[in-house]
């Protein structure tokens, strides 16, 4: 028996221009960078930016704090 997550048809695609209609970033607009159909989420350029702490590696002996976009739910965006 398979217990997978149902793939949802979304109204936005990669490279679409969208506007955020709900949440902390309401009113911001940007381009869709990535779509996650199984989770119903999208990553929008310049929206929902969070800080990510990276461990020290050979390339970065000090480690780093990187700001990057995180996914938001597709119901919180509309095409613009």
UniProtKB/Swiss-Prot annotation:
InterPro entries: KOW, Rib_uL2_dom2, Ribosomal_uL24, Ribosomal_uL24_CS, Ribosomal_uL24_KOW, Translation_prot_SH3-like_sf. GO terms for molecular function: rRNA binding; structural constituent of ribosome. The keyword Transmembrane helix does not apply. Keywords: Ribonucleoprotein, Ribosomal protein, RNA-binding, rRNA-binding. One of its GO terms (cellular component) is ribonucleoprotein complex. GO terms for biological process: translation. SUPFAM superfamilies: Translation proteins SH3-like domain. SMART domains: KOW. The keyword Ribonucleoprotein applies. Disulfide bonds: none annotated. One of two assembly initiator proteins, it binds directly to the 5'-end of the 23S rRNA, where it nucleates assembly of the 50S subunit. One of the proteins that surrounds the polypeptide exit tunnel on the outside of the subunit. Belongs to the universal ribosomal protein uL24 family. Part of the 50S ribosomal subunit. This is Large ribosomal subunit protein uL24. It comes from Chlorobaculum tepidum (strain ATCC 49652 / DSM 12025 / NBRC 103806 / TLS) (Chlorobium tepidum).
